[in-house]
Amino acid sequence: MEILMTVSKFASFCTMGANASALEKEIGSEQFPVNEHYFGLVNFGNTCYCNSVLQALYFCRPFREKILAYRSQPRRKENLLTCLADLFHSIANQKRKVGVIPPKKFITRLRKENELFDNYMQQDAHEFLNYLLNTIADLLQEERKQDKQNGKLANGTLDSQNNNSTPPSTTWVHEIFQGTLTNETRCLTCETISSKDEDFLDLSVDVEQNTSITHCLRGFSNTETLCSEYKYYCEECRSKQEAHKRMRVKKLPMILALHLKRFKYMEQLQRYTKLSYRVVFPLELRLFNTSGDATNPERLYDLVAVVVHCGSGPNRGHYIAIVKSHDFWLLFDDDIVEKIDAQAIEEFYGLTSEISKNSESGYILFYQSRD
């Protein structure tokens, strides 16, 4: 059995080598971007949800640069962030241009830190993205807190420059991914408008058949009437009143991560099923849909990465990533890396027919601001 496994692994790595060689030839030595590396990631048992998100994040350049800069700092106790930094550093410093890397240390750490991922079952890529970004932000905040405490112990006082800098809750994760929504409620009796801000690292949007991501975002901020048992308690009127409620974007992030809500619970089936609806996502996205006091009311975004779900349900199927690197597109399917045409992205919009049919459809979109 062991001999068979060894032969199987050897054959697999030979195939990877052939794929890598073909990719290098297809791109061409003259066109190959300087200091760029395209490495597939080994699947450690249904870890495609993780591999696809990591590849997408690696090609979000601001995020990659921050992770690599973090890796160059003095070594800290091992955690999920240090493991991610080691993985990105390993990819960025390979002698070869293309190949395969096993993210074993990262996966081991992930399974150790969160029991949700401590198994060999398929997991949700969006849940993993959310967990990863929030964990990194928490670790950075804790490190900042520790550094300030150490500074106080060493010097007897905190560095005033540090003390007056960015708020303690703000990290480079927030600087890259965080946007702000304003929840506006207008009382229909006294016309008083109350608003509440809410920060986000990604936006989850409902999907409909034969629409576009622009349409989904527009629906996200539609006005809702609060009436009957859902009336709004107005502080001015001091009673429950009918009201209009809507969500608007107050601050747009540097990188906008959009999660398409493709998994819906069906009462008649007593389970979640996939909405394979066709949702067009353009290579360029201009956002106007903002609040009156928006800090950046208009912003142009470029699509840089897409996490794609392949299959018919949330707990079965497969995840791949398509990313933009310089002027061309690549498809990462675990250890396989292929160059694709920009037109091929249309294949990942979804289907115009059955909702639960097998499909390869965009699940998480990463748009990077031009400014």
UniProtKB/Swiss-Prot annotation:
Please verify whether the record's keywords include Zinc: yes
**Enzyme Commission number:** 3.4.19.12
GO MF term list = cysteine-type deubiquitinase activity; cysteine-type endopeptidase activity; metal ion binding
Top EC group: hydrolase
Answer yes or no on keyword Cytoplasm: no
Q: What positions does the domain USP occupy?
A: 39-370
The identity of this protein, by name, is: Ubiquitin carboxyl-terminal hydrolase 12A
- Gene from which the chain derives: usp12a
